[in-house]
Amino acid sequence: MILRPSATFAALSAHVLLRCLWMRVCEASGHFEMQVLSMQNVNGELQSGACCDGARDPAERSCAADQCDTFFRVCLKEYQSRVSSGGPCSYGSGSTPVIGGNTFSVKPLDQTNDKTRIVLPFSFAWPRSYTLIVEALDFNNDSSTGSINGQVIEKAVQSGMINPNRQWQVLKHNGPVAQFQYQIRVTCDEHYFGFGCNKFCRPRDDFFGHYTCDHNGNKTCLEGWAGPECNTAICKQGCSIEHGSCKVPGNCRCLYGWQGEYCDQCIPHPGCVHGTCIEPWQCLCDTNWGGQLCDKDLNTCGTLQPCLNGGTCSNTGPDKYHCACPDGYSGQNCERADNACLSEPCLNGGLCVESSLGFECQCAAGWTGPSCNINEDDCSPNPCNHSGVCVDLVDGFKCICPVQWTGKTCLIDANECEESPCVNAHSCRNLIGGYFCECLPGWTGQNCDINVNDCHGQCLNGGLCKDLVNGYRCVCAAGFAGDRCERDVDECASRPCLNGGRCQDTLNGFQCLCPPGFSGATCQLDLDYCESGPCQNGAQCFSLASDYYCKCPEDYEGKNCSQLKDHCLITPCQVIDSCTVAVVSNSTPGGLRLISSSVCGPHGRCRSHSHAGGHFSCDCQDGFTGTYCHENINDCESSPCLSGGTCIDKINAYQCICADGWEGPNCETNIDDCRTNPCRDRGVCRDLVNDFYCECENGWKGKTCHSRESQCDEDTCNNGGTCSDEGDSFKCLCSPGWEGATCNIAKNSSCLPNPCENGATCVVTGDGFTCVCKEGWEGPTCSQNSNDCNPQPCYNSGTCVDGDNWYRCECASGFAGPDCRININECQSSPCAFGSTCVDEINGYRCLCPPGRTGPRCQEVTGRPCVIGGRIAVDGAKWAEDCNTCYCHKGIVTCTKLFCGPKACRMLGSGRGDCPTGQLCVPVRDEQCFVKPCSSQGECWSAHRPAVRTHCQPDSHCANVTFTFNKDTMPQGVTVEQVCRELRHLYVTKNVTSEFSISVSCELSSAASNEIHVAIHVTENGIHGRVPVKEITDNIIDLVSKHSANSSVIGSIAEVRVQRKQPQNPNVDYMVPLLVSVVTAIWVLALASVFLWCIRHHRKQSSSATAINPTSPFSTPEENTANNAREHLNQIKNHIEKNASNGSLPGKELHCDDKNTVNAKIRTQFPESDASRRLQKTRFPHQPAYMLVDRDDRLSSNGTDIKKHPQWTNKRDNRDLESQHRVPDSQHRDSQHSLQKMEYIV
């Protein structure tokens, strides 16, 4: 049993293949492959629940042992979001032969197993998206029809995208009946590339090109070739572009008139002797040459020098000259001597003697030559030694010796040190033939006069090196610093760029890359794009980050609202053409091709009407009518069949089924039953209707005159009739359904009344009938309407309405067209505001807004976004930066200004830890370790640590807080900076308004190991009467009291003491100055009186006062805590008091410390704060009120001193407070009245 693979392809593929018969290459070519990997059908069942083969075992309720004959069938079509199993397989379909039984598997790499693979070729641009329907079927060979069918075991539907690739994509389907695994891939055929397999590239090396193809299908020229088609040869390197060419790479073929290896030499005129050329066939003469061929010598005197014996030569013409001879000579060339010595030719005292050849010179000593004009060289051979230079003299020589030698021939050693040649040296040593200088450091050279160049490679980054003696100095280029100019000065360190600008450090400067909407050197200018008023027709303008936006009125559109909205009045709206649908194609520019929608069926041609309603009409073929050309015209309506014939309607034709005995197109001809001459023994045949009659002679009887005995024989009665001999004739008794003299006429009772419905034709067949149904009907009596909706023809969830041989698709919302394949483009009306992108969706649209816009149609403007370090934050965004909180408001970034301190790190071997770039992990100092050990703890610091303020004088800008911790509940390794970091990260600390710059710094108490002093400093006062220091301290107390902070460190706080200045009432009226003046006057009078009394008292008791109070009252550290009051949190009263100095007598309200200071002991109570009352109720609801006492005068109930609490200030603070005591009395009193110290016991 072999099942042959089959495949069907879309009409598009066939069309492209026909085109390929005459085109050089197809526009696209590839194939889709599917390979089955495994199948598991444990129960051997079908999707319907029935067994594949045989009945179910009633005992075990399982299928029989006979397994399924499993094969697979695929259908590949265009991408569908809602897959319809009906409709054509537009990309192709195919099936495998029977692969196996219920369960089987194949190796994925078995590429030779064609039995499990289905290959669907395509010749259109692969669209990447697809829908694949995979069916596992049980083979069923219908022997009666010869067709190959199958019953569905399991069906998988896969929609997605796949690009051409050699790699397989493995998919798995887990169905309720069976599970199977398969793999798919799309591969381009040879020479085709790209995502659509529509880029053709075939390597070639011929006249039309010389190239190979890379993996993307791009042409890669072979070596020596260039050009888009790689058919331009690359000539020999250096070959003249103007005068050379080549057809073979590496050659250089010269044009006519040019020569040379590179075709850069012109060919001169033939015969040109002393000339050159610039263009071919020229003859440009060399100097002193002339003539057409440059063969005429214009300087014979210079070339030949023909004049002898001192004659003077003159050029007189081309190739002509004249010699002017000296006295005593003649001839053309002065070659004849007449009186040679007459001209005194012998020089330098030489004696002239005439001879037959002219004259001879007898030269003086030291001279030689024909005329004694050559000085004899007395320096040859060189008589000077030790590289001395010989100077030739007349009849002698002179040696110029090197400095270390002397003498006539430089043989005597000279003492060079006598001339002090060494410039920068310790000493000079004379040597044979020279000397040696022992140079000072930094000098070199034979005479130590050359400064050693210490600048070699020292100054970096373009720095100018100034060479010094035994050293150097670098003059750095702008933007660099350091001894060697090795450090780039970072001009961006000060963060000069505003409004989110990104700073780029440059040489000796910086450059700000401004975010959209800002400009200027530091991005300080906010660009207002609406300043020029670009919006028209009353539109509102909004300035955005990098552009402007015009909010148009209802009837206008465009960037500037300058265009009237179309409303389909100017350009036509989207026309829904019911006659066509678009399919993927590579043969059209848009990638789509229109094909018929088949709305008029197979018997009509669609004609679309040009309006937006999608109306159409069908032009029907001959023989059909109806709206969709679905009705076959009844050609039997005129009853063309005669003689009782039955008319069968056909397409634009009819067929007559004649009654027995008749024939012809319309049954108009009686069949001649005598044509076979049935009568025997000379009987005469008479033709009847569907019968004959024989007139017998000579006593013959029977139907055919063949019997002597009876009128009946075996052929007398037809169709089972019984013959009865009645003497001279016979009679036939016919069987049911037949009549006539010889039972040859069939009764028409089977079709009476007509059993066939819906216009069908009834045809009598023996004793039965057959109904010939009209198109669109089926069944024995044509009573069943054919389901024209199967397979489902409507796309996109359209509803199919079945008619009589027609159907109609009622489309879901958002779709149109005859088969609901057209998605109505809601973006056609441009609903989105200008600058936004409209995305068409099913029955709707979606607007993609540009930055700065929002709303369903992007018509609303949001605040300007902020740009932070290349990141964009939307308007209203909030984020954390270390311990600070930042906000984006209309393009401006505002952050709280809390000093965050150094980052914690773990000490590693490299010393870098996890610190930012430019910082090192520095070990925590021992005095900074709060809960030991802290050996592994570190802090990230740069080379230059900023100064941290760890204490302050309490005022409106600063408060001092002392925290006492229960260290038993704290983990090990807690540092002082970690405690400070926890306080900075409290919500109440880091969310203070950005109008204040806040610093929270900490240090370990020197008096108690479980206390930490915290200084909270604010750079400026709050606005509208707010005091940020009081707000922060109150919030911290409230948070600590409720244990709201999720921190073990904050939860370990046992006591809080606050020292801060009481805020002044901002609403002081005009009476305040008056009251102050009155009080000041009274105070001055009292002070004067007290001062006079103190002078007299001091004179009397100076000796006793010295014994009682030998030291200054301001030298004791206790005075620094004189204003500290310890309070229980159940009764928080902020008081101010002044204590008497040590040595004062009890009970004295006023006493004199010195002549300049008077201390008044005053008790003042301030109202309880809200935080104090809340803390009292939550922590100590039943604690009695605590007694208020002076810090240094507290007594127990039995009169003994209460142990003093360790003071919070260190020695430096004591010195500061001591110096603060020595201020004028008025200033001292004001500060004492405004200072409040509170202690909170937690």
UniProtKB/Swiss-Prot annotation:
Q: What are the record's GO terms for cellular component?
A: membrane; plasma membrane
Matching entries from Pfam families are given as: DSL, EGF, EGF_TEN, hEGF, JAG1, MNNL
Locations listed in the record = Membrane; Cell membrane
Extracellular compartment ranges equal: 29-1070
Disordered: region residues: 1191-1242
SMART domains, per database record:
DSL (SM00051), EGF (SM00181), EGF_CA (SM00179), VWC (SM00214), VWC_out (SM00215)
Keywords, sorted A to Z: Calcium, Cell membrane, Developmental protein, Disulfide bond, EGF-like domain, Glycoprotein, Membrane, Notch signaling pathway, Repeat, Signal, Transmembrane, Transmembrane helix
- Share an example GO biological-process annotation for this protein: hepaticobiliary system development
For this UniProt entry, which residues form the secretion signal?
Answer: 1-28
The way it spans or sits in the membrane comes to: Single-pass type I membrane protein
Cytoplasmic domain ranges by topology: 1096-1242
The DSL domain sits at: 186-230
Q: Where is the composition biased (Basic and acidic residues)?
A: 1210-1232
Q: Please give the positions of the paired cysteines in each disulfide bond.
A: C188-C197, C201-C213, C221-C230, C235-C246, C239-C252, C254-C263, C266-C277, C272-C283, C285-C294, C301-C313, C307-C323, C325-C334, C341-C352, C346-C361, C363-C372, C379-C390, C384-C399, C401-C410, C417-C428, C422-C437, C439-C448, C455-C465, C459-C474, C476-C485, C492-C503, C497-C512, C514-C523, C530-C541, C535-C550, C552-C561, C600-C618, C620-C629, C636-C647, C641-C656, C658-C667, C674-C685, C679-C694, C696-C705, C712-C723, C717-C732, C734-C743, C751-C762, C756-C771, C773-C782, C789-C800, C794-C809, C811-C820, C827-C838, C832-C847, C849-C858
- A GO molecular-function annotation: calcium ion binding
Domain EGF-like, residue spans: 231-264, 265-295, 297-335, 337-373, 375-411, 413-449, 451-486, 488-524, 526-562, 575-630, 632-668, 670-706, 708-744, 747-783, 785-821, 823-859, 917-959
Which positions are glycosylated? N141, N218, N385, N560, N748, N960, N991, N1046
Sum up the protein's function in the record's words: Ligand for multiple Notch receptors and involved in the mediation of Notch signaling. Seems to be involved in cell-fate decisions.
For this protein, the record's PANTHER family field holds:
CYTOCHROME C OXIDASE POLYPEPTIDE VIC-2, DELTA-LIKE PROTEIN
Protein name per Swiss-Prot or TrEMBL: Protein jagged-1a
Source organism: Danio rerio (Zebrafish)
